[in-house]
C-alpha cells in the first residue's frame, strides 16, 4: 500500500510539473559549502525522535561521492518505513556517483535540470521534470549535464537497500570533454 501511495504521489508530482509552464525550480543546498577532495559518509547530526513523521536532513546520514555529489540517505529500517528508503542529492555540474548497482529497482525524481545517464548498455540524457526507472541489479551512473547544481531524489522499495560500487563513473570524462 505504501509503495502504491508513493508511486502515485511521484506520478502526480511529475504529471503536474510536466503540464505546468516551464519555471525555474529552487535548488536546495544540501552538501558542504566547499566540495571535499575525498568521498565520505557521516552519521546524522541529530537522532530522529521516536514517532516523528518528518525526517529532516540533519536526521539522515550524509555522504559525498567524489566528484560532485553530496546528499543524505534514509534507510527505511532506521526511520520506521516497512518497504522504502530514500536518497536526496545535491549534484554539481559534471558530478555524479560511481557506477554502481542495487539489488532492488530504483526510481529517480528530478524536478529541474538535465542528467545524463548510463543504465546497463544504454546512455541517454533526460531533461526534468521526470521519473527515471533503474532496474534491479543493473549497473548505472549519472552526471549533472547542466551548468548549475540540482537536487535528485532516489526512491528504493526496501527498508534496507544495498549499494555496490562497480567502477568509476564512465560519464565524468565524457561530460568534461564536451
Regions found by a protein language model. Name each.
Residues 15-17:
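C-terminal motif of bacterial Sec signal peptides marking the signal peptidase cleavage site
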Residues 71-72, 87-101:
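Conserved short histidine dyad/triad with adjacent acidic residue
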Residues 80-82, 92-94, 114:
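Short, charged/polar surface micro-motifs in flexible loops or helix N-caps
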Residues 136-162:
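Ligand-binding loop in jelly-roll beta-barrel domains
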Amino acid at each position: 500500500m505504501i509503495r502504491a501511495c508513493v508511486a502515485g504521489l511521484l506520478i502526480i508530482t511529475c504529471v503536474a510539473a510536466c503540464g505546468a509552464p516551464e519555471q525555474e525550480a529552487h535548488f536546495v543546498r544540501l552538501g558542504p559549502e566547499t566540495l571535499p577532495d575525498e568521498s565520505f559518509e557521516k552519521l546524522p547530526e541529530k537522532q530522529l525522535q521516536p514517532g516523528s513523521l518528518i525526517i529532516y536532513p540533519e536526521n539522515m546520514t550524509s555522504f559525498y561521492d567524489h566528484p560532485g555529489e553530496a546528499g543524505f540517505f534514509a534507510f527505511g529500517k532506521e526511520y520506521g518505513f516497512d518497504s522504502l528508503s530514500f536518497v536526496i542529492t545535491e549534484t554539481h555540474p559534471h558530478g555524479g556517483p560511481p557506477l554502481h548497482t542495487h539489488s532492488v529497482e530504483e526510481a529517480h525524481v528530478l524536478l529541474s535540470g538535465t542528467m545524463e545517464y548510463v543504465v546497463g548498455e544504454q546512455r541517454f540524457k533526460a531533461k526534468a521534470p521526470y521519473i527515471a526507472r533503474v532496474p534491479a541489479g543493473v549497473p548505472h551512473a549519472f552526471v549533472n549535464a547542466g551548468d548549475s547544481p540540482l537536487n535528485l531524489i532516489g526512491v528504493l522499495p526496501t527498508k534496507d537497500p544495498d549499494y555496490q560500487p562497480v567502477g568509476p563513473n564512465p560519464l565524468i570524462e565524457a561530460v568534461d570533454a564536451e
